[in-house]
């Protein structure tokens, strides 16, 4: 009789014809009993490329042990990672968003190719998180995501954004070389993902809210007993999911994605969450659009006073209880759907039932009557500069509107050099284009320019718009994901120096002061300003990637 717990591995190892397969597996440690067990793949993103992932092999070992102890046979395999923090501001950053697709494709390929019945995915650096979940949703086999964990604070509560902003301070002459080197040497003390509510911590929190991580997985330091235990529990959880036939399609829904968006907003999370949640929803067959972020954002406040716009680090949020008490606050306020299923086999409300509130003395997560911002910091803007939408991150500290004069650059490097050379005046709207998914290719993050702006003391005096992305560490008056992008003839590619641009975060508008006849005249003479690769992964990506307004996916319609 067929073992219903082994719908995929049985095809690989059962019967006379699969004798060669069993022979191969014996060489990697299988014994007679292992062939009777469900096989669980452990997808590790370990790499010495980045501190975000340097410890994940050990975490994979703990996940393997947890799965084996629960009665499965676990098999560890690896995939790649690209370090955003290291490649930022260089041509290598073009490969960052591309790596999301490569990681997703490779996990799907390994799990489906080897016939694993379930999977634990473990991610550290930014693109790991959405990539792992996208693969889980494509495969639709019992699976749990484990976050590799956040880094400990550096000296004087420094983190990677401290280093980027120190570059701008050095260029402005407000610090000297010795002070810059001191920041460089003390900001990153060891393993773990970047320490504010940047993209990695944002996405880990979103995935926990989505129901595909165990409770508290998003709020544990990388080097901690809690994180090791999380991995062991994840291995066992996948075995339980196999036994009760609980799959991602039983967990993810429009309601669960609304929960994820709600938590991202309450935490003041990264603009990258918009791009990644759209992509994840596409892989799960869920109808999610940019406008859903606006609808939810009208009712959900920002409650967490965390970096980059706030004061506190993720490690400090962990100390007071992580995001589970916040989620319970949101549930009790009627802002979360409590009846959605999670990977524990229980509903969200059941998972949160016994969660204790934050200590009364803490001021990291605020009460609803004293929010950091009364509505969402993530704004979806439309207008003649962004007919298909753009994404802004508006904390309110930089104001709610900006009107200025365009200064156009056709690459990140051109803009960064102008900022560092002191050539950007107050009242300027810096336009960085041809950095979209197709135009980059790869949709680079603009952390170097935004950090240089902040370091130069121009954070409240200039704005930046781009068809590229922003790091979760970016803050200031910044608008990204402008669509259509310049490379496909979008209006951002028609701008000229001196054009007047208006950004209105209250009206959710992004516009240039030009009538349609002038835009049509410019469009008629527009030509692509840069060459795109003709070979290799960037060429394949540019040919297949969708608009950022649809998640920049490569397997869509």
Name each model feature, range by range.
Residues 1-54, 59-80, 85-86, 91-96, ...:
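Catalytic or ion-coupling anion/metal-binding cores of large enzyme and transporter domains
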Residues 96-105:
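Glycine-rich, highly charged phosphate/nucleotide-binding loops
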Residues 111-132, 144-147:
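A short, small-residue-rich loop immediately preceding and capping a beta-strand
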């Amino acid at each position: 009789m067929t073992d219903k717990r082994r719908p995929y591995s049985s095809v690989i190892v059962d019967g006379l014809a699969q004798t060669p397969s069993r022979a191969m597996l014996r060489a990697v440690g299988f014994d007679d009993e292992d062939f009777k067990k469900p096989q669980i793949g452990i997808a590790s993103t370990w790499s010495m490329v980045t501190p975000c992932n340097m410890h994940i092999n050990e975490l994979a070992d703990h996940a393997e042990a947890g799965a084996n102890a629960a009665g499965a046979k676990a098999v560890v395999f690896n995939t790649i990672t690209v370090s955003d923090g290291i490649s930022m501001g260089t041509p290598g950053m073009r490969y960052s968003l591309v790596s999301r697709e490569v990681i997703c494709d490779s996990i799907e390929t390994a799990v489906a190719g080897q016939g694993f019945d379930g999977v634990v995915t473990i991610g550290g650096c930014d693109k790991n998180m959405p990539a792992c979940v996208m693969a889980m949703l494509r495969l639709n086999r019992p699976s749990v995501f484990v976050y590799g964990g956040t880094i400990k604070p550096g000296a004087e509560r420094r983190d990677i954004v401290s280093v980027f902003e120190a570059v701008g301070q050095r260029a402005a002459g407000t610090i000297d070389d010795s002070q810059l080197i001191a920041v460089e040497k003390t900001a990153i003390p060891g393993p773990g993902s970047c320490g504010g509510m940047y993209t990695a911590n944002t996405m880990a929190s979103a995935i926990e809210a989505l129901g595909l991580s165990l409770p508290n997985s998003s709020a544990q330091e990388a080097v901690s007993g809690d994180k090791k235990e999380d991995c062991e529990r994840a291995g066992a959880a996948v075995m339980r999911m196999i036994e009760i036939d609980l799959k991602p399609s039983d967990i993810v829904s429009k309601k669960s994605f609304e929960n994820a968006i709600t938590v991202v907003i309450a935490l003041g999370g990264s603009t990258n969450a918009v791009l990644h949640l759209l992509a994840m929803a596409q892989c799960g067959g869920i109808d999610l659009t940019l406008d859903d972020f606006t609808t939810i954002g009208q009712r959900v406040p920002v409650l967490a006073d965390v970096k980059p716009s706030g004061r506190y680090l993720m490690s400090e949020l962990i100390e007071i209880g992580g995001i589970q008490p916040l989620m319970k606050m949101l549930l009790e306020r009627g802002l979360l759907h409590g009846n959605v299923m999670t990977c524990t086999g229980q509903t969200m409300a059941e998972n949160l039932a016994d969660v204790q509130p934050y200590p009364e003395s803490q001021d990291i997560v605020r009460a609803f009557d004293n929010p950091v911002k009364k509505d969402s910091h993530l704004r979806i803007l439309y207008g003649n500069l962004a007919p298909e939408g753009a994404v802004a991150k508006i904390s309110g500290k930089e104001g709610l509107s900006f009107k200025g004069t365009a200064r156009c650059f056709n690459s990140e490097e051109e803009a960064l050099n102008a900022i560092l050379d002191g050539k950007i005046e107050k009242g300027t709207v810096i336009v960085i284009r041809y950095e979209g998914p197709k135009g980059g290719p790869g949709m680079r993050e603009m952390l170097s320019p935004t950090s240089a702006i902040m370091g130069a003391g121009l954070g409240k005096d200039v704005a930046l718009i781009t068809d590229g992305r922003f790091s979760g560490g970016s803050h200031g008056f910044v608008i990204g994901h402008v669509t259509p992008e310049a490379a496909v003839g979008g209006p951002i590619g028609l701008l000229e120096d001196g054009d007047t641009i208006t950004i209105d975060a209250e009206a959710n508008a992004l516009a240039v002061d030009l009538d349609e006849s002038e835009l049509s005249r410019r469009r008629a003479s527009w030509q692509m300003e840069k060459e795109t690769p003709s070979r290799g992964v960037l060429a394949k990506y540019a040919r297949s990637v969708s608009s950022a307004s649809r998640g920049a996916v490569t397997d869509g319609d």
